[in-house]
Structures are given as structure tokens and as C-alpha cells.
Amino acid sequence: MNSNTPTDIVSFCFETQADHNATGPILIDGLTPTRSLTLHQFRQLVCQLIAGLHEQKIQQGQCILVHLENSILYPALFLAIVGVGAVYMGAHPASSATELEHLLSLANPSLIITGRDTLSTVLQCTMSPSGGKKEKIPSDRVWVLNDIDQVLCEAFSSTPDASMGDAAYHHRRDITKLLHSGQRPWRTFDDDGQKSKITPAAMFATSGTSGLPKAAILSHHALIQQHISIHHPVPYPVTRLLTLPLFHRYGALVALFFPTRYAQPLILLPGFQLRPFLSAIHVHGVTETYLSPAMVHILIQSTPQSSSIRESLRSLRYVCVGGAPIDSRPLQSLQDMLHPEACVAQAWGMTETATVFQDRYCLPSRQFDKGSVGVVLPGYQVRLVDVSGSGRVLDNATEIPGELQVRGSGLFTSYKGHPDHTDGDGWFSTGDVMYQKNGHYFLVGRMKEMIKVRGYQVSPVELEAELAQHPLVKDAAVIGVLATDGSSELPRAYVVPLSWAERPSPEDIYDFMRQRLAGYKFLEGGVVFVDSIPRNSGGKIRRTKLSELDDQRDKLIALLT
């Protein structure tokens, strides 16, 4: 990091690196484009929220949990929380009470900000289970975002209505009340950067695909370094569209830094739906967006020959795909739908590491194997270690799979309550198996998820990629199940048909896979048709959940036979 670079997140965001029209919007509501914020308005809103949180006696290092869907207010809340000296943590607004209770136990927040439609779930978690008067979290520490337009009106009105706030939801606090304390500057660091490295800024919940989520703590320094790693100048004006959740680490990085630091407009949607997504790209001339593999499949299955869809996507120049494994073939299909100068590429990262690999924008003549998750980004070191457990480092090995280990300035500090996460030299074991070829890295799968078939290691990711090529398959997931004689694991596929009326038979699926894979990779565990595959908000398959459903299915079959 340059010695003149600000070391706290808020200063870093507002250290604008571009000449721009200060009256132009930097954050735009994709569903209601007239709802937007300029850089000046955004900065004012952040300082107002900091003043309001300060009035609530928020102490340095306390956690504030944000339980909201994407909106143009979300980045302001994040920066205000960090700016007052607190620690941000986000929660999925669709979390069940059980899931939210787990996050509350991790975060131990001093204040919760939720929405009108999600307040009831929060109250289930914060009220005493006995129905008594004692609350787990006092009612005056649960604040509600009732109406975005009301917040914007209050923030920028010359005569804000100080009677607002307590009136909404009776004794629940409306966050407009936070806007009635004037403005207050954010906390900065007055040393050479050491405080930035040890001061927590945010906690992000890990994916929870193989167990309960943990809270990964990230410092100011780590988040700034993560942004520096992914920032890359491009030869076109950048307007971004984001449908990924802002409570997710990658969504937060995109929404926080790019609009403020580089005056690059960001259009926000609450989630991915095809029609609003295409409309936002077309209306705003979006040049960059970020997709999960599930979103890619929706796009390429939605009449890819349609001229109207192709026209809607024509302004795109860079599409970054990540969050879960994907094969090169659907990426190439998406590439073929875009402008000749567009680039579709993968990225790989974790909550704990941020984005470590990425293929950045380049012209088609210089493009790469789309099956790769990319090259190592600046600020990181990586190595592959023998998966047998010997600890042997696979130095410069080509196409030999090994467990990925990472170190660098963008790594998380620790899991909350679990300080030890790296070895003595700072290497973090990711649990992902990869191989490298010509400096590009390729994902094989998770070590825990590899299926051991009669001595062979079978990657469910590989089988899922082949299943996705079947013309009658919409989605699929593969897990290992124990053979009836207990001698081996066998691959079992859960398949979502493109149409139940024309679904393939299990035999069709078996034959399709036999023609494409080695014998030990056959779906000897069976094929099960389902309505949907359980995935997390980033698109990753929740294999623990799928295994639980599989166990229930086997028990039911045993009862009926």
C-alpha cells in the first residue's frame, strides 16, 4: 500500500481517484432509477448516520448487524458503522429464525438494523423464549428501515421531521431517527498503518456449505488490500450492475469502493431476476456485472438465440463469474451471446481470503481457457500441497492436483472465538483442490467433498459439469453415498429437470454419463429427480443439507419396503 494511501476504509473510499461530475449519481436503484445518490449526497448521508449511531452510545469494537436486502442505503450503513468505530456484520434477509439465531450468537450485536418485512423474524430471535419480559436484545436496539424514500427525504430535507422514528412500529426505532443528530466525521487512524491491521472493520459469515457458518473477522487493512487486488484499469467507461447480496464479502467490496473512489456508477438490484436484470443493462448501458453459475445457466437457457436478449446484453464488456464451480462450456455459450469485444471470465475466492484468482478483462484475441479460475492476483502467494496429508509442497507441478494454500495481506484476521487459522508461516489451508497449467489455476473440488470410489478420487464438480450439458437438465448436484455392502462410496446425482413433463428417465442420464466419463465415475449411487438444489446465496451447493435430505429419503424408502 502506498504510504499516502488512507488506512481506514471510509477515508479510502472517499479519496476519489477520478475527475467527475459531482452531480451525477454513483448509486442507482435498478428497479426505481429515480432513486439514486450522488457522491456528495452519499458522503453527507454517511456522516449523518455516523452522528446518529454516536448518539446511540455505540462503543468502538461493538458489532452492528445489518439484516436487509440490497438497496442504495446499504453501502452508507456499512460505512457509517465502520466510521463510528463499530464492526459491521450482515445477515441474509431471508434467513430463518434458526439461521438468524446462530448469526446473533456469533456476532453478539449491540444493535440490529432490519426491514419492515423481516422484523418479525428478528423479534422471534431477540425476545425471551419463555414469553417473559426479559429480551435477549433490548427492543430499543432493534431499528427498522421502513421506507427508503422517507430516509432520503429526511436526509436531504432542510427541515427534517424530528417526530419521525419512534412513531413507526410503535416502540421500534425507525432509522430516520438516526438522521436527526447533524453530521459527524468518521474515525481515522493517526499512526503508520499498524492500527489498520489490527482494528476489525467487518465480520462476514462463511458459506456454511459443510457445516454451521463461522464469523470471519476482517481488518480495515485487509479490506483495502482486497480492493487493491481486484482493481484493474480497463479501456472503456465502467458502469456496473450488482445483483449479488451486499452481505456477501464480494458484493460488499464492489458496492463500497468502486462507486465512491472512482465515480463509477453502480446499479443495484435486490436479487437476480431475468427481466429486471436485462432491463437494467439495457437502460443504463451496463459494461460490467458479476454472476453466479446458476445465473449463467438461467441466461443461456432463456432462449439464447433471442435477438432481444442479445441486444439487451450488447453493452457488456466484462462478466465475472464466481461463487461456485462452473464448467467452461456454459461460459463459452454466454460469451457467444455478447459483443465481440466482451470478456467472460471466472474468479475464485473465499470469505477468508477474498479474491485470489481472477482472469481480468482482455480482448478476445488474448483470451484464455474459460475452465480456469484465473491467475494469482497481486498481494497474494499460493502453493499446492499433496492431498495425501504428507504436507509436501508441489513446487511448479503442472496438472497435478493439490490442496490450495494462500497467504497475503488480504487474508482475514481470524474466526471469532477461534484465533488459530494459519500455520506458523501465515499459510491458510483452503480445503479446495486445484491444479495449475501455464500459470492458470483450475478447480477440482473440495477435499471434504471428493467421493472415494474403490480407491479413486471422484470430483462431484466434474460430474455436475457433465450433467449440466444434458439438454433436459436444468440443475444438478452430486454427493457420495455408501454402497449397500459398505465397501465404497458411490456417486448419486440429484437432478432438476428442465421440464417435469419431458423429464429424462434415470436410464437416459446413466447412458449420457457413460458416454462421457470413465467407468469408476458412473452414477452407481442412482439418479434422483427433485424440484430444486439447495444452494447458499453465493450459488454454492449446500452439500450438508443435501446429504441430510438424502438420509431422510433413504430412511423413508426403508420404511416403505
Curated annotation (Swiss-Prot):
The gene is ppsA. It is a single-pass membrane protein. It catalyses: acetate + ATP + CoA = acetyl-CoA + ADP + phosphate; propanoate + ATP + CoA = propanoyl-CoA + AMP + diphosphate. AMP binds at M203, F204, A205, T206, S207, G208, T209, S210, G211, L212, P213, K214. GO terms for biological process: secondary metabolic process. InterPro entries: AMP-bd_C, AMP-bd_C_sf, AMP-binding_CS, AMP-dep_synth/lig_dom, ANL_N_sf. SUPFAM superfamilies: Acetyl-CoA synthetase-like. Keywords: ATP-binding, Glycoprotein, Ligase, Membrane, Nucleotide-binding, Transmembrane, Transmembrane helix. Residues 462-540 are annotated as: AMP-binding. This is Acyl-CoA ligase ppsA. Its EC number is 6.2.1.13, 6.2.1.17. Coiled coil: none annotated. GO terms for molecular function: acetate-CoA ligase (ADP-forming) activity; ATP binding; propionate-CoA ligase activity. Belongs to the ATP-dependent AMP-binding enzyme family. Glycans are attached at N21, N396. The keyword Glycoprotein applies. Pfam families: AMP-binding, AMP-binding_C. Disruption phenotype: Abolishes the production of 2,4'-dihydroxy-3'-methoxypropiophenone and 4'-hydroxy-3'-methoxypropiophenone. It comes from the Eukaryota. The keyword Lipid biosynthesis does not apply. Gene3D superfamilies: 3.30.300.30, N-terminal domain of ligase-like. Its main location: membrane. The chain crosses the membrane at residues 71-91. Pathway: Secondary metabolite biosynthesis. GO terms for cellular component: membrane. Acyl-CoA ligase; part of the gene cluster that mediates the biosynthesis of 2,4'-dihydroxy-3'-methoxypropiophenone. The first step of the pathway is the conversion of acetate into acetyl-CoA by the acyl-CoA ligase ppsA. Acetyl-CoA is then used as a starter unit by the polyketide synthase ppsB and condensed with 4 malonyl-CoA unit to produce the pentaketide backbone. During polyketide extension, the polykedite chain is probably reduced and dehydrated by the KR and PT domains, respectively.
